[in-house]
Amino acid sequence: MDKELRQLRQLFSSDNVRVEKCGIGKVNAALGAQCMINEFHPDCIISSGCAGGNGDDINVQDVVVSSELCYHDVYCGTAIDNTTQFGQVQGLPVRFQADEIMLHHAQQMKNENGFQIHTGLIVTGDWFVDSKEKMRSIIAHFPDAKAVDMESCAIAQTCYLNHVPFISFRVISDIPLRDTDASQYHDFWNTVADHSFQVTKTFVERL
């Protein structure tokens, strides 16, 4: 991950952009976002990383931009009034919405500069999806999910509570339903990650 952090810091050399590493998983992601908010008071937060993809139209190296986000490993019961849904933290939205202005800019980038960009639901959990069975269990609850990761929704929740606009970019590293041993994921880091993160730089330059 240190290599990827150096790559991102090289991409974003402006004093107006701060690049930080959160680490893997929901707690690390939330703590990283909160520290950034407390120290730098950002106008917005953009999360960049990789994710497993879902859908016939999704391929490795494509980019999924969050239109909405939720957890795939949270269940707080149904509540007395049956309002709480699977994936929802009780008292918070069923799904966290990406910032509309940033989402609009991201949608304008579709098919530009060779980028294949999809917008949709990103689901998050502390679970590395390395088998078809794991992926099927997630998609059973969230068939409309475009990507599955371990950080995005935790950052979205932190930003929601702090009233900071948020969006997540996830480069598709593998398609779990087409991969049996996580080989796509490891090949991704060896071959195409350097090029793929250029999409986030292009997005920042549009803001």
Language-model features: locations:
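N-terminal short beta-loop-beta anion/metal-coordinating cradle
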Residues: 1-41, 58
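His/Asp/Glu-rich mid-to-C-terminal helical/loop segments that flank catalytic regions of hydrolases
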Residues: 176-207
